[in-house]
Amino acid sequence: MVAKAVCVINGDAKGTVYFEQEDACAPVKVCGEITGLNKGQHGFHVHEFGDNTNGCMSSGPHFNPLNKEHGAPTDENRHLGDLGNIEAPGDGPTKVCINDSKITLFGENSIVGRTVVVHADPDDLGKGGHELSKSTGNAGARIGCGVIGICKI
């Protein structure tokens, strides 16, 4: 059974990101466009809570139900919400196209109802040596966010 979700991102960064998963064992395809980003890499994560009452700050930490350290999307040891970086061209919208086999739209670890956060700085993927590397990737301020919601199939 196919599952689809959507996230409308607001803040200094704005955009729409779509999620699609063919079944519970398939990777999730994440595609969309985001505007308002400076040229370069920006951390892109799923955070624990779908609460944006205090802007992006109330979305909590990265979604991490398995209690792992922060890492790259290809690392075995990573938060489920660690989707790495998106690359902004600086002269137009940033295209997002990620296939991730750790996140899911099904079951108890579903990302539906949680928040996507776009960060001001690059995610160092847990390898930067900064005190925040193993928790946030030292990705800086939260400049855009939105709650992931179920959408019509």
UniProtKB/Swiss-Prot annotation:
UniProt catalytic activity: 2 superoxide + 2 H(+) = H2O2 + O2
Source organism per UniProt: Chymomyza amoena
Origin organism lineage: Eukaryota, Metazoa, Ecdysozoa, Arthropoda, Hexapoda
Chief place where the protein resides: cytoplasm
Disulfide bonds: C56-C145
GO CC, one annotated term: cytoplasm
Cofactor list: Cu cation; Zn(2+)
UniProt KW DNA repair keyword: no
Quaternary assembly: Homodimer.
PANTHER family with a match to the protein in the record: SUPEROXIDE DISMUTASE CU-ZN -RELATED (PTHR10003)
Name of the protein in its database record: Superoxide dismutase [Cu-Zn]
InterPro entries the UniProt entry points to: SOD-like_Cu/Zn_dom_sf, SOD_Cu/Zn_/chaperone, SOD_Cu/Zn_BS, SOD_Cu_Zn_dom
Co-factor remark: Binds 1 copper ion per subunit. Binds 1 zinc ion per subunit.
